[in-house]
């Protein structure tokens, strides 16, 4: 939009950087198996996580990936993210990315669309293969941009 509005490369770059500074990405992981296969989690931690049916939620802010929460079901993970979004009164945009299941992405989008201003709807797209390989089947990404 900025380029179409006649902004030069430097101005567009500044707008992109400023938007990135307001962005947060959550990753809801349905199975820890692919974190182990990708070397992101030890085999021991993966075994324990699988046995206990742990569903980790990670968050990426300013290029740093950290654990946000651990739940015992994917439904609880979705509730945790909805609760976080409800506490953010300055939401501007929400994007939902899925690895293999667009139905879950669409259902979650419907359940949180009331949180965006002016009747906006969340963007929905399939996650790229690089991130999808680490998140595994059933993974869901939720990206937010705040004002």
Spans of model-derived segments:
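Mixed-charge interfacial surface used for oligomerization/domain docking
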Residues: 1-147
């Amino acid at each position: 939009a900025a380029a179409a509005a006649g902004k030069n490369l430097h101005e567009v770059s500044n707008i992109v950087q400023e938007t990135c500074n307001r962005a947060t990405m959550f990753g809801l992981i349905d199975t820890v198996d692919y974190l182990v296969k990708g070397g992101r989690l030890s085999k021991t931690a993966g075994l324990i996580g699988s046995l206990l049916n742990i569903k980790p939620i990670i968050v990426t802010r300013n290029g740093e990936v950290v654990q946000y929460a651990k739940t015992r079901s994917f439904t609880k993970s979705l509730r945790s993210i909805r609760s976080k979004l409800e506490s953010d009164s300055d939401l501007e945009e929400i994007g939902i990315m899925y690895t293999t299941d667009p139905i879950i992405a669409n259902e979650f989008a419907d359940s949180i669309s009331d949180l965006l201003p002016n009747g906006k709807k969340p963007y929905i797209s399939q996650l790229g293969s690089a991130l999808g390989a680490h998140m595994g089947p059933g993974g869901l990404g939720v990206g937010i941009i705040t004002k």
